[in-house]
Amino acid sequence: AGLFYIDRENRMSHLRHTEQRKRFRAILNGAECLSPASVYDPLSARVAESVGYKLGILAGSVSSNTTLAAPDLIVLTLTDFADQVRRMMRVSDLSLLVDADHGYGNALNVMRTIEELEHAGVSAMSIEDTSLPIRYGRPEGKDELFSGGETVGKLKAAVAARRDPATVIAGRTAALKVEGTEKT
């Protein structure tokens, strides 16, 4: 197929996304360690796929850099992020893991994040426990974490919002960086 060819009946199907998610789960359960391609737009996803990658990763910082030419200060909205993912998945069959940052807010926002990103076609997403955006006046270089209860609540909300059981939802923590080895 040419560079601009899009099979609309196949490329946009939710069945296709489920197959990509199942492939991601098979990779997780396999014995082989695979490195994902760092992808950030439709062209990079297509190039990664053309050279043999089956797995892609989209970091929140990379998305902010490439979409807005902005630093990773949570100025990229969920809508911006989901639209970028949707454009990538429209032209690629990669199983895509995305960094969903802190879920774009509280547990209700996390539910919408899951809905939007799942609909966009991601195979897996991570949600972190770092309090974002960065609170004004916090000590320089000192990240803050959500409470354990809030983090667990957000992850439970994420799982409850998931429509496709093949979608992987992962929690990610900065506890070692923030708290050190004594508390973790």
What are these regions (language model features)?
Residues 28-43, 74-75, 97-109, 144-146, ...:
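Active-site mouth loops of central-metabolism enzymes
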Residues 70-98, 120, 140-170:
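Alpha-helix-loop-beta-strand connector modules within alpha/beta enzyme cores
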Residues 34-36, 54-55, 95-97, 124-126, ...:
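Structural preference for beta-strand elements that scaffold enzyme active sites
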Residues 12-38, 46-51, 156-160:
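N-terminal amphipathic alpha-helix/helix-capping segment at the start of soluble metabolic enzymes
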Residues 56-80, 100-107, 126-149:
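Glycine-rich, proline-tolerant flexible connector loops at the mouths of alpha/beta enzymes
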Residues 107-128:
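A short alpha/beta connector and helix-capping loop motif
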Residues 48, 56-57, 117, 125:
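Hydrophobic residues within beta-strands of alpha/beta enzymes
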